[in-house]
Amino acid sequence: IREKLILPHVALKSEYYDLSLLNRNDTDDQVTVDAANATKKYGVAVKCATITPNKQRMEEYPQLKKLWPSPNGTIRSILDGTVFRTPILIDAVHPAVRNWKKPITVARHAYGDVYKAVDLHTDEPGECTMTFRGESGRETTLSIQKVDGPAVFQGQHNKEKSIRSFARACFQYALDIKQDLWFSTKDTISKIYDGTFRSIFDEEFEDYRARFDALGLTYFYTLIDDAVARVIRSQGGFIWACKNYDGDVMSDMISTAFGSLAMMTSVLVSPDGCWEYEAAHGTVTKHYYRYLRGEQTSTNPLATIFAWSGALRKRGELDALPELTAFADRLEQASLDTLSAGTMTGDLSALVEPGFSARTVSSAEFLDAVAARL
């Protein structure tokens, strides 16, 4: 994408950080921290999909020193902020949910919860407790569970400051794009943890209520299971704010139901004004292995193209470079026009409406077709 679509038109002034699994291994993951700090320094970043290793990957990469954490988790922890994910719609592909007419943006809290959790596996009977030791010296201990055999435990956290930043980002984003905001947790079960999220959202909304009313916008809270039912019955056209894990899962569901996971934009917005753009999907491992075998792949690059266009547009806005923002617009329009003309990758050609003439091309051929329209 960079070589075919960006460099022929833009004199990039960028720093590059190699977040490949082996380089993260070689640097003891310091490169990920450096990349996050560089994003804080420069304000705008583009991130490619990365590998988070599991036990299977340890067998594939025996040189790995450990199961390195998710680079996304590390970066989001450093930047804090909120991830906004919005599907890219085209006329030739209708959503699997027939009544969806407008995009649904998932606002995902980008800090804490299971992504900063600690896990414990035990092999004997006993009791697991959780202790908070304040700087004052005061301690609070809770019993998690007594077990009569092997068990697993997990401890997770979040910070009120981060939750407030999340709430404010969601309310401001709703005002910016003039859409209703929904927020969902499970505070009937998680009365303190999820209940704190709900209380903070309710408190912060009071500072935005008048502006919401002036625009005729609505904010409402509902339980996560009720929210899922409401989303499916809706026509779309709103922002759905979710905790970290809920947003991870639901954004994949939303993007796939709208057409393809490769048709969803993703931007992390931090409280201090940093913007990190990426594709919402992962590394598409099976396609990569086929590519290594010399086979042609038809992998949809649109979300990564839009990550580049989003970052270039934001850079242009911040630096008052209208030519750069105009190029970002042209890049997106060239990509959409290519799809409208029937040139598309296999994930989309299998979903087009009856009567639409689609030609399935490889990833490289699709990029060439977009480049020809720039």
Regions found by a protein language model. Name each.
Residues H9-V33:
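N-terminal beta-loop-helix "entrance" segment that forms/cooperates
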Residues R24-E139, Y245, V249:
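N-terminal glycine-rich phosphate/adenylate-binding segment common to multiple enzyme folds
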Residues A110-G112, K116-A167, A174, L321, ...:
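Glycine-rich phosphate/pyrophosphate-binding loop and the adjoining helix
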Residues Y16, L21, Y193-W240, N244, ...:
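Active-site rim loops that border cofactor/substrate pockets in soluble metabolic enzymes
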